[in-house]
A protein has these predicted regions:
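Auxiliary tRNA-acceptor-end handling modules of aminoacyl-tRNA synthetases
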Residues: 25-294
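Bacterial Sec-dependent N-terminal signal peptides
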Residues: 1-26
Length: 294
């Protein structure tokens, strides 16, 4: 009897200690690898700034230089290094190709100093004037700056931020494809040919090329005219405009005062910081940085 009881107790203990079939299956079942969540794609922020690869796509053709110029289908983008915001640049506008009766190709139409600026939402292109000045060490300097506020030539949306976060991407099409008068046919000559407006459907960017110190833009402008110099049946004038923008050197050339005894081109500047206690127009010689080529 005792042996039978002992046998039953041992059997019961083994039943408790032995894993069930379900437990064995769970024990030897292959563990699934942990699920790795894919990073969510970056979304554009509240200012409409998109991820870089959503703007400058794999289809982009890039021309590296002063600004990297990206071409994506029919859109053109400037990628402006942060180090060049605030730097002064010279923009020279010429008529590269002209309609018969207007003049000759290559004639200069406008020259202006520009400065690119950026805030948190936009990029501004300003026209800089040095006609009125005062040394920044003088108390009157702030008053001179406030009375010589720089006009905004164009305002751009920020499309993206560069891959290394040290540059800003803007779309440049509208600067050259809309009627920005400072970069197109001069207002004085528009009156001569009775130009009423620019035809956007016949105006477009031809080429944009970037070099280490400058960017060369060529664009076609078509203007509606009631008195065109040639092909009057079209009622329009088409021109190819050239805009050359070059970075000005940080170290300026030494100025030379103008003297009427020497026949030389010159320009005036009103200086409010002289010791004469009044503003005075000072004339300086026009100088060109001519350097021997290696």
């Amino acid at each position: 009897m005792m042996n039978r009881i002992s046998f039953l107790l041992i059997g019961f203990a083994l039943m408790i200690a032995s894993p069930t079939h379900a437990q064995l299956c769970k024990l030897f079942k292959k563990k699934k690898p942990p699920v790795i969540e894919k990073p969510k794609p970056k979304k554009e922020d509240k200012n409409g700034i998109k991820p870089y690869d959503k703007v400058i796509t794999e289809k982009a053709i890039t021309d590296k230089g002063l600004f990297d110029v990206h071409t994506v289908d029919d859109k053109f983008y400037y990628e402006i290094p942060d180090s060049l915001f605030g730097a002064e640049m010279l923009m020279v506008t010429r008529i590269a190709k002209t309609a018969s009766g207007i003049g000759f190709g290559g004639g200069k139409q406008n020259t202006q100093v520009l400065r690119w600026e950026r805030d948190s939402k936009k990029v501004l292109l300003r026209v800089v004037s040095h006609e009125v000045v005062a040394a920044d060490s003088l108390p009157i300097h702030e008053a001179v700056v406030n009375s010589n506020f720089e006009p905004i030539l164009y305002r751009f949306d920020i499309k993206s931020i560069g891959k290394d976060s040290t540059s800003t991407v803007i779309e440049i099409n509208k600067l050259f494809e809309t009627d920005v008068k400072a970069l197109g046919f001069p207002a004085s000559r528009r009156k001569t040919y009775k130009i009423s407006s620019m035809d956007k459907s016949r105006s477009f960017i031809n080429t944009l090329k970037s070099y280490p110190l400058n960017i060369e833009a060529r664009h076609i402008k078509t203007y509606n005219s009631s008195s065109p110099p040639s092909n009057s049946s079209t009622g329009s004038i088409s021109l190819e405009i050239s805009n050359s923008m070059i970075l000005l050197p940080k170290k300026q050339m030494k100025r030379r005062y103008f003297d009427q005894r020497v026949g030389w081109f010159s320009r005036g500047q009103t200086d409010y910081g002289l010791d004469v206690q009044e503003s005075k127009t000072v004339r300086y010689l026009d100088r060109w940085r001519l350097e021997i080529k290696d």
